[in-house]
Amino acid sequence: MKSDNYYNVSLMEGEHVREIRIFEKVKPKGKKVKRLHITKKSGNKKTNMESRTKSNHRAKKKIIGLIQNNFLNTKFSFITLTFRYNLEDVSMANEILAKYIRKIRKISKEEFKYICVMEFQKRGAIHYHLISNLYKPDYKKIHEYWASIIKKDERIKDDGGSVRVENISNNDDAMRISSYISKYMTKSLGKESLFGKKCYSTSKNLSRLKPSNMLIDNAFNNENEINRLIDNNQIISRAEYTDAYSGKRIKYYSLAK
């Protein structure tokens, strides 16, 4: 049932996946949480951290949804790009990555799609994980491109970097990659050096999940309605957890279509 004012089921519909969130408590549409008035002398740091935590959660959810919606049921490559130099400058690393993306876009035989996530090693050095539809790429070329861009950058005392390629052709491995990215995004997003910056980039041509909401009578405990929403699709993952803001329970399902 559709309602103009309230909902207790949230759907994110995509080409390859469907995400379902079923709320124990009915939620009003369009209601915004009022910001607390906090002086500069008290509470500012805590408020900034809470805001950042929410933003980080949204970013991770967005990237996992994009990975699953664009790369499940497909063949793709998972490329890890590292610097030999202990590079910790986020802006500099992202400049090098942007040049590399422009280079490898040219060798793609189809419209190039990608998701790239930054990760920090224990010593603080940056490296990247690049998911793209460039399946079984020419390893020699993609390695030469990465090394040559780094060598030409006078700011870096480095003679190149390394490239590791894993070709993915089944959904089990795709979900393994998705879980790996989720785990390390959680770690990276907490870095102070990323404050006000993104730890990921994506191509504009990715298929996005489309949101919709509905109101279903007693949806949280209504197994028939839950099964109808799942609609015989494969359950990739499921969870039940407590909403940090309302204190009420949420059921979550990620489905492969």
Residue ranges and their predicted role:
Residues 1-124, 134-257:
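Right-hand nucleic-acid polymerase module
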